[in-house]
Regions:
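C-terminal motif of bacterial Sec signal peptides marking the signal peptidase cleavage site
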Residues: 11-13
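An aromatic- and glycine-enriched ligand-binding surface/loop that stacks and positions planar moieties
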Residues: 15-74, 105, 144, 148, ...
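Conserved, well-structured interaction surfaces
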Residues: 34-50, 71-141, 157-193, 337, ...
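Long, intrinsically disordered, low-complexity segments
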Residues: 94-97, 173-175, 259-321, 412, ...
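Structural register within alpha-helical repeat arrays
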Residues: 123, 130, 205, 212, ...
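C-terminal substrate/ligand-recognition segments
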Residues: 341-453
Length: 589
């Protein structure tokens, strides 16, 4: 089933409650009294979960809000250009969705005798969704009012004076909702991951606890610190939830003769029901009128639908060699675009377009191929789109391969969207264990080693990498490798900004800008273009002093101007502060 039911109620932000027609006393027919009514309502709430839109790339291009993608239409938050209204849409959307969920609880009147396992599992889905949207607001705003009831009954100025909970109180509330969800939900096997389930709730709980635990650790001495540091408590909760998850008998998906095939299949398949690792996913089917345009955009080489963009050299350099050893990004071999991918972690090859890879069906697309240009060979040479136009132009030489359906020719896209994966739980467990100094061979074997071996990377005991990203503070070799693994396993899936924020990683943002591949005159990349296109590239693409692509040098001459004392959180909308005098604005806003 693809959940695309229309929204049932009109929703708006807290400040609009006074203007809305009250719905706290519905007619008898509006109560949710039977299984069909409950299921229909919950199905409508699935619209609030991540999805691919009919236009654009969705989550695939979202990480231009991080150091994984550089875009002409750069992220305002990274560049310190947010203003006091920049959080309004996120605040409104979050509380709109919470109001939807709480309307369900307010009007849930199923007689106890009819509350079978299916009905109770639907109720569990509501608890999951309430937790999901509180978590979204927590990440963006920190301390927030917890919407644990249907607030329309408070639709007076006095009634809406609701103080924010501290961020650790919000996180505890989220985890309590997920306990309720877990106890009510069916297991993943009941609906093959197409509905919210017990295991998905466990992984969400681990992500919540990891986020809060590491936020409280790394922000313990700044203005974003929690009033009470409960870092170890939340990291311990990751371990507790993880131990329960391990008892569910889930395995990482493995298939294919070539390393990386299993990883690629998680993102380029239409049906994920048989991949138990994908705990929750969204299905697309043209026959059911549910489709997207991700395939069409990827086929054209688009990285950001708003304009020219490209995957950064920083992300490419994050991946290990397939033998488990570090790369040395200063090695001359990496000036050769083709050699950059040789002998590397197969996830790099499945995430970034490279020699021999196709943007679409083999019958309609030429594989990427770099070779010195001649008129005789022009029909077989197919380099990155550095000379392209509009949003098909690459700024870095690195296009997205992740999620490309190589059976796609044209028309509607039907590749499925993973929403929650078991791999997220393994990464959370590994990180929490390392932060709590609980790391052991047993934990390594079932987390970091399992992920790398599934990907086709030899697992080596963590050691210090002198070229690893400098976060501005010391990391143990284990934490270094866990952070590397998160970036490799979760690239272009919407996690990177959250990781940078909770790790207090402004050193990776402020004064920095993404760069791209080596494009010196002697490079195979540059030689693959016709003379006319070489001229276009030289006119439009800025290079740094060492001839690496530096496309935003003119636009961001001093790099991103991220405000480390302000931009870790979004501003609470002024209209909410005006209405609710018990709210306090976030630091420096």
């Amino acid at each position: 089933m693809a959940f695309v039911a229309a929204s049932i109620l009109p929703f708006s932000s807290c400040s609009d409650f006074l203007d809305r027609e009250p719905i706290t006393k519905p007619e008898a027919g509006n109560f949710l009294t039977g299984a069909i009514q409950v299921e229909n309502y919950i199905n409508g709430l699935y619209m609030t979960l991540p999805s691919f839109s009919k236009f654009g790339l969705g989550v695939r291009s979202e990480e231009k809000n991080s150091d994984n993608i550089i875009a002409e239409k750069y992220d305002a938050r990274l560049h310190g250009q947010n203003n006091q209204f920049s959080g309004a849409s996120d605040w409104q959307t979050g509380y709109q969705n919470l109001r939807k969920v709480n309307y369900f609880f307010h009007n849930y009147k199923v007689p106890e005798a009819q509350e079978n396992e299916d009905v109770l599992s639907l109720k569990g889905e509501a608890y999951f969704l309430r937790a999901y949207w509180h978590f979204d607001l927590l990440k963006k705003f920190g301390s927030i009012p917890v919407m644990d009831a249907f607030w329309d009954e408070n639709a007076t100025i006095a009634g809406l004076q609701i103080p924010a909970k501290t961020r650790n109180e919000v996180a505890r509330f989220i985890l309590s909702d997920l306990v309720e969800a877990k106890n009510l939900l069916h297991s993943r096997g009941k609906y093959s991951g197409i509905r919210i389930n017990k295991e998905a709730a466990m992984v969400l709980a681990m992500n919540v606890a990891l986020y809060e635990g590491t936020w409280e650790k790394y922000h313990s001495s700044d203005d974003f610190a929690s009033s009470t540091n409960e870092s170890n408590y939340f990291l311990g909760e990751v371990i507790n939830w993880g131990n329960e998850l391990f008892g569910c008998g889930i395995d990482l998906y493995k298939t294919g003769q070539n390393p990386g095939d299993a990883f690629a299949a998680l993102f380029n398949s239409k049906d994920l029901s048989g991949m138990g690792e994908v705990l929750l996913w969204r299905k697309y089917s043209s026959d059911e009128g549910v489709f997207h345009d991700v395939n069409g955009n990827l086929k054209a080489g688009v990285v950001d639908s708003e304009g020219a963009a490209g995957i950064t050299q920083s992300l490419v350099d994050n991946y290990l060699n397939a033998d488990g050893t570090f790369i040395d990004p200063t090695n001359e071999k990496f000036k050769d675009f083709k050699e950059t991918f040789e002998g590397r972690d197969p996830r790099l090859i499945q995430t970034v377009m490279n020699e021999g890879a196709k943007f679409a069906s083999a019958t309609t697309a030429t594989p990427m191929h770099l070779e010195e240009y001649t008129d005789e060979k022009k029909n077989t040479i197919s380099p990155p789109k550095l000379a392209g136009d509009g949003n098909t132009r690459s700024l870095t030489g690195y296009h997205i391969r992740l999620g490309i359906d190589t059976t796609f020719v044209s028309g509607n896209g039907e590749t499925a969207l993973p929403i929650i994966r078991y791999a997220e739980g393994l990464l959370a467990y590994a990180e929490a264990a390392a932060e709590l100094e609980m790391w052991s061979d047993d934990i390594a074997n079932k987390t970091l080693k399992a992920l790398r071996e599934r990907a086709g990377v030899k697992y080596l005991a963590p050691a210090k990498d002198a070229n690893f990203t400098d976060f501005g503070y010391t990391l143990t070799p284990v934490l270094q490798e866990i952070r590397r693994e998160r970036r490799s396993e979760l690239a272009l899936q919407g996690f990177r900004l959250d990781d940078l924020m909770r790790w207090k990683a402004d050193k990776l943002i402020g004064g920095k800008r993404g760069k791209g591949a080596y494009v010196g005159d002697e490079s195979i990349l540059f030689k693959s273009y016709s003379p006319d296109n070489q001229k276009r590239i030289r006119e439009r693409l800025t290079l740094d002093d060492n001839k690496w692509a530096d496309p935003m040098a003119g636009t961001l001459p001093s790099g991103y101007q991220f405000h480390a004392d302000r931009d870790y959180l979004l501003p609470i909308p002024p209209s909410e502060l005006e209405l609710n005098k018990k709210l306090k604005q976030n630091p420096k806003w």
